Amino acid sequence: MLDYETLDAIADAYTPLLGGLWLLLAVSPLPRGQWRLAALRIALGLTTLVVCYGLMFADKALGIWPALGLDYSTHSAVAIAAVGILGTLLPRLRPTWIASLLAYFALMLYQRYHSLADIATTAAVIAPPVVWLCMRFAPHVAPIGHRQPAPQP
């Protein structure tokens, strides 16, 4: 079995790895002169991060999770956002992204970073806006063969 420090290093590398992959996918259209596509992919990522960190700041100011005896899991929120983005940009790999997220949650529980309630409540609040954003952006940012018509208001 891997020791705590090794598992800690793996956990610490997870979201930066996903973030780096998002950035790579976001800028990959630039060599083909697809500035708008790159800008939309970057906007999707930044918007989901605003949701994650905006809720973190709201929790710090209002003490929402502590009032329930819980802790807002920024790690979980950012991981959910990253998996949502990657699932939008690389839809064929969506099951892999989701499996990696579940494994990350299990690792956080094993390492005692957060409780199941911390992760579940964070996911319950973060997932809906992230999924909505990904679905809204998908027609504009997904690979050509996977683009759907934009939803009508």
What are these regions, as identified by a protein language model?
Residues M1-Y110, A127, V131:
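Hydrophobic alpha-helical bundle signature of multipass membrane enzymes
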Residues L24, A123, R136-F137:
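Juxtamembrane/membrane-water interface recognition
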